[in-house]
Amino acid sequence: MLNPLSRWLLPLLIGNLSILTCVAQTSTAADSEALQIYQDHCAGCHGAQRTGAMGPALLPESLARLRKAEALNVMLHGRVLTQMPAFARQIPEEKLQRLIELIYSPPAEPPRWEEKDITQSRVSYPVPDNDKPLFSADPQNLFIVVELGDHSATLLDGDKFEAITRFKTRFALHGGPKFSPDGRYVYFASRDGWISKYDIYNMTYLAEIRVGINTRNLAISADGQYLIAANYLPGNLVLLSSKDLSLIKIIPASSGDTTSRVSAVYTAPPRHSFVAALKDIAEVWEITPSDTD
């Protein structure tokens, strides 16, 4: 037999349970709808797993510096000088808000980017048959100015501070350009894992490769033969040949059963090595390219 307090509490608990069930069902339906919108309108450019394709990755790590309000504005009105369309007339704003919540949330399964993905992503462009600069400026006194807003870079004459050329880059370059020892080539890393090699003399790209889903920075060896990228996702270091950006080795960032993101990697010229800082393990690593085999 129920006491008076139980008679009062039981209906209240049942009512609250019903409300929670309805909320959960509504949330699930909203999530499913957002997933469907993503598959219908976004997956073609940003990848079925949100890891990026023609467009950038849409994952929390990749969107860390983009506020949700800015992301919504891009969805509504598109992005100038890109293939990002405006959806204001196709999709109600409240549904785009759900899509925003989706892309700023971790996926159910962590995305993978493995050796096969890296090697298949590599693109080579025609190599110009010219070893002299196509400009009159001093090739040893140049600047590369990275423009974050519209994902472009400018080659600047260091004597006159005048632009020599301006060219498009991958989405959200990060970590600063890295120059070859002779100053002819510059290498870029984007937040969504693209490494690009640019021939300054001929003002053209030579090769690109995607080494990860979220990349922190890039370093070039003192002799100019190697590049190494530090990745948050997946947590590893990726060693490349600077000649053609071909993959040499993937170095997982792990110690025992613990894995880590890689915060940064830098060149140690006197030691002919690289030094990497791990974020989730209290360790600093030294990597000697000649010993990676």
Where are these regions (language model features)?
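A short beta-strand motif characteristic of beta-propeller blades
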Residues: 162-168, 204-209, 246-255
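Repeated scaffold domains used in trafficking and secretory/extracellular systems
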Residues: 125-126, 130-132, 173-178, 214-220, ...
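Residue-level detector of Asp-centered blade-edge/turn motifs that repeat once per structural unit
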Residues: 138-139, 181-182, 222-223, 269-270
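Electrostatic cytochrome c docking/interface patches
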Residues: 20-37
